[in-house]
Amino acid sequence: MRSKVTGAQRWVVKIGSALLTADGKGLDRNAMGVWVEQMVALHEAGVELVLVSSGAVAAGMSRLGWTARPSAMHELQAAAAIGQMGLVQAWESSFAEHGRHTAQILLTHDDLSDRKRYLNARSTLRTLVELGVVPVINENDTVVTDEIRFGDNDTLAALVANLVEADLLVILTDRDGMFDADPRNNPEAQLIYEARADDPALDAVAGGTGGALGRGGMQTKLRAARLAARSGAHTVIVGGRIERVLARLKGGERLGTLLSPERGMLAARKQWLAGHLQTRGTLVLDDGAVAALARDQKSLLPVGVKLVQGSFRRGEMVVCVAQDGREIARGLSNYSAIEAQKIIGHSSESIVRELGYMAEPELIHRDNLILV
């Protein structure tokens, strides 16, 4: 299975704050230089590379003399704005020593939720990669709100992997990978070398939260791997302090935890759908509708919906769940929540009678539906 790593042509590499800062005292230029040497070596081996870099908030905190990560949004945004300048300059100067160009890309969830902006971002990133430029991506912390933020750069990296149709997502962390128990408390804990990203057994061993400088613990990394898997990408969660870790992964060594997708790459539109994290409502399905979606991959008809929850407009993303609460799919609703309330449980032929018009015969068309 490690051939999926050695043969990957397009990598997204995410480096966390703890690996880029000197114990929280600003950016570690020497460490960044070592990372650049490894990434340049990948470039020279023919790998197309996109870098998702944490560290802006940590760098800003250092410049401001703060020792504890603030909880107030405006303080986080101020730290990010200050730190982002130094972070990008550090990457640029380090890559320039090897004759490589970099490009700064700041994204928000809105950029990926809007189809037109998603396509524009994808086109720009693909062009940069084809030019041999290394895009350096971070969340645009200065403009996001709690409602539209990605939450952590692990999630952002997974969505970038979706965006650029990456073969491989590498999440570098301060742990050697995922273990079957917490190695900090259990000396018998064993590294999980390979697993399916959707294996439910992983949830039980992915406990823990992020450190003082970062937001993402192992749970967020598992969630990121599952997001990346939706678009067919493999994910390696691996220790960033392992010497020459990127080169050794490329060489086929069994380092870290390799999480593999169940399905191959999605069609372009469904890749975009997979990048939606913000949902506006929930549709509770009967057993027949669950089978139609999960087994037969059909459209969702009003007759198969038992309950509408939340407030959403036509074209917004909703979650489809079974009656026991299991999430089955996500999709773009053809009707608002108010309209959906009136037509659920009825056949498509009855929509005109209930509403006085029919926008579409389906509540969610299968082209706008993605199984989870």
Curated annotation (Swiss-Prot):
The keyword Nucleus does not apply. Catalyzes the transfer of a phosphate group to glutamate to form L-glutamate 5-phosphate. PROSITE patterns: GLUTAMATE_5_KINASE, PUA. It comes from the Bacteria. Keywords: Amino-acid biosynthesis, ATP-binding, Cytoplasm, Kinase, Nucleotide-binding, Proline biosynthesis, Transferase. ATP binds at residues 14, 173-174. One of its GO terms (biological process) is L-proline biosynthetic process. It holds the Pfam family AA_kinase. Residues 280-358 form the PUA domain. Substrate binds at residues 54, 141, 153. The gene is proB. The keyword Hydrolase does not apply. One of its GO terms (molecular function) is ATP binding. Belongs to the glutamate 5-kinase family. GO terms for cellular component: cytosol. InterPro entries: AceGlu_kinase-like_sf, Asp/Glu/Uridylate_kinase, G5K_ProB, Glu/AcGlu_kinase, Glu_5kinase, Glu_5kinase/COase_Synthase, Glutamate_5-kinase_CS, PUA. This is Glutamate 5-kinase. It is found in: Cytoplasm. It is an enzyme of class 2 (transferase). Pathway: Amino-acid biosynthesis; L-proline biosynthesis; L-glutamate 5-semialdehyde from L-glutamate: step 1/2. It catalyses: L-glutamate + ATP = L-glutamyl 5-phosphate + ADP. Its EC number is 2.7.2.11. It comes from Pseudomonas syringae pv. syringae (strain B728a). Its main location: cytoplasm.
